[in-house]
Amino acid sequence: MARALMRFSRRELPGLAAGAVVLALSAMPTFGQAVEASAEQVVQRLVEDIWATLRRDSADERHRVDELMAVLEARTDVALISRLALGRYWSRLPESERQDYQDLFRDVVIRSMARRLNTYAEDAKSPLQQRFRIVSSTAVGEHDVLVRSKVFPSHGQPLDLDWRLREGPSGPVIIDLIIEGASLLVAQRSEFAAVIERGDLEGLLAELRARAEAT
């Protein structure tokens, strides 16, 4: 065996080393595959956290909604979503009002989503694997990943629920939900644009303030 190994000349060693590197790299996941797997983990952990929150007994509905908001904010980029929801009007919003707008967006839009999730407390009594399953994931452009999943409600037909994530400094974060092909971000942008076109940006802020006070 030793004699056989000695037959390799020094000139052959670089080629052998290169071949070993190629084989090693081919066995490793690509960058795209790694990002997609990371995005799936973010979605899975978010859903698990939502499920755990819904399963906890809570006589105070507002407290559980607050908990659900915290769960959502931990896995989403609310600041980015609020900017995307405003679209081209973001650049027209005075810098002095941007933080106010983003705070209102959180209080109105994210709280509304948390309230909607709170209505699924009955479904959460079932094991999560009976109600939710990740199907696949794929890269979208250079920075985003779309994670496709299925939701199996206790009543009604299964739903397609897709999650759009964008790579951030600390990993992928959720920036949109697509329910049965309908983007929540696109719907929110259309709603905001309609309010602005009827009046102006101040009109949108006034409406958001009124809705926040009503919650």
For the regions a protein language model found, what residue spans apply to each?
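Sec/Tat signal peptide C-region and signal peptidase I cleavage site
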Residues: 28-34
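Short beta-strand edge/turn micro-motifs at domain boundaries
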Residues: 158-186
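Low-complexity, intrinsically disordered terminal/linker segments enriched in charged
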Residues: 176-215
